[in-house]
């Protein structure tokens, strides 16, 4: 029931006047993962301005930008430290939590989406919204029943958060009746004047709902690690194919201090993947890769961004060069 869900989830917010639905959806999904133990309001302003892609708040965005911002520990920061709507983000703000895992769910796998809503509270997903804001109308939206269903070729242009579902929601409640009953209950970012205090129904048969789905499943305190080594703040922006279903990739780093390697974080771009993580100590050149040593291995059920803890810490000397190699 929408009225009950409104009591359990973060208050619906208003992205007006910017094209920042992606930031609102990702941070609401992040906040729902932390509830009910932690009630926190993250800053959409900070994410949308400090997005590492040199894009403005009116350029739009999507979930890979949100994951990149969070995975790099650029944020999130608190709303009170960077309030929304002024087009300005103060310098020097630091993340108040660290994202260590975000899973990308398989397209249109509704059982997996429902399970994730049950476990984590909210799933970030996307729609094609013919209407640009709450002041507009659309032939695909019923203002009285708060129901939306678009069936057609248009690609997603708006992010929302799936916070519930109703398998018996009547198909007759939609302006264009789909082939069956059922709807996801979604939180929008157009303020409380849209839908039922910001929440609405989206048919299971909508062309885009459930195609792109993200859950933020690993959130830790900022004291979890002393340092993060990274070379690319844009994260996963795409992939190219190979003539095989496996690949190696590696990065070379120089230790800033005497410290220990405790975890390795990377993207897996396909579901049901297995991985092996290696280290090359005292790295000199390409020939050094032959000395790689296995640290750990495992599997991922879903695509996404993962942090894998190393069973035995590896001591690193200040100024020493080392390579991390992943086989996946």
How would you name each of these model-derived features?
Residues 297-304, 316:
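Short proline/glycine- and polar residue-rich coil/turn motifs
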Residues 127, 268, 326-328:
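Conserved "cap/hinge" positions at secondary-structure junctions
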Residues 1-262, 270-298:
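Catalytic-core signature of thiol
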Residues 251, 304-306:
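Short strand-edge motifs at loop-to-beta-strand transitions and within beta-strands
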Residues 264, 306-328:
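Short, well-structured beta-strand segments enriched in hydrophobic/aromatic residues
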């Amino acid at each position: 029931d929408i009225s009950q869900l409104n009591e359990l989830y973060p208050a619906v917010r208003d992205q007006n006047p910017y094209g920042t639905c992606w930031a609102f959806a990702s941070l609401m999904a992040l906040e729902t993962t932390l509830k009910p133990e932690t009630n926190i309001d993250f800053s959409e302003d900070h994410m949308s301005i400090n997005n590492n892609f040199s894009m403005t708040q009116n350029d739009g965005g999507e979930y890979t930008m949100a994951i990149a911002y969070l995975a790099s520990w650029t944020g999130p920061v608190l709303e009170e430290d960077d309030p929304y709507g002024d087009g300005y983000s103060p310098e020097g703000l630091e993340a108040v939590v660290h994202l260590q895992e975000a899973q990308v769910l398989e397209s249109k796998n509704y059982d997996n989406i429902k399970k994730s809503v049950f476990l984590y509270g909210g799933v970030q997903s996307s729609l094609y919204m013919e209407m640009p804001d709450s002041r507009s109308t659309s032939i695909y939206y019923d203002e009285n029943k708060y129901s939306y269903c678009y069936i057609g070729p248009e690609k997603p242009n708006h992010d929302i958060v799936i916070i519930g579902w109703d398998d018996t929601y009547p198909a007759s409640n939609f302006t264009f009746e789909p082939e069956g009953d059922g709807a996801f209950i979604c939180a929008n970012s157009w303020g409380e004047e849209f839908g039922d205090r910001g929440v609405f129904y989206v048919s299971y048969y909508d062309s885009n709902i459930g195609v792109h789905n993200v859950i933020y499943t690993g959130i830790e305190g900022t004291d979890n690690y002393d340092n993060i080594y990274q070379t690319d703040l844009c994260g996963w922006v795409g992939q190219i194919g190979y003539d095989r279903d496996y690949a190696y990739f590696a990065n070379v780093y120089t230790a800033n201090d005497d410290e220990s390697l405790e975890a390795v974080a990377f993207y897996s771009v396909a579901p049901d993947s297995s991985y092996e993580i290696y280290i090359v100590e005292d790295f000199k050149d390409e020939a050094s890769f032959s000395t790689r040593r296995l640290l750990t291995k495992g599997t991922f059920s879903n695509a996404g961004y993962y942090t894998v803890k190393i069973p035995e810490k590896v001591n690193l000397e200040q100024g020493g060069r080392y390579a991390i190699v992943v086989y996946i």
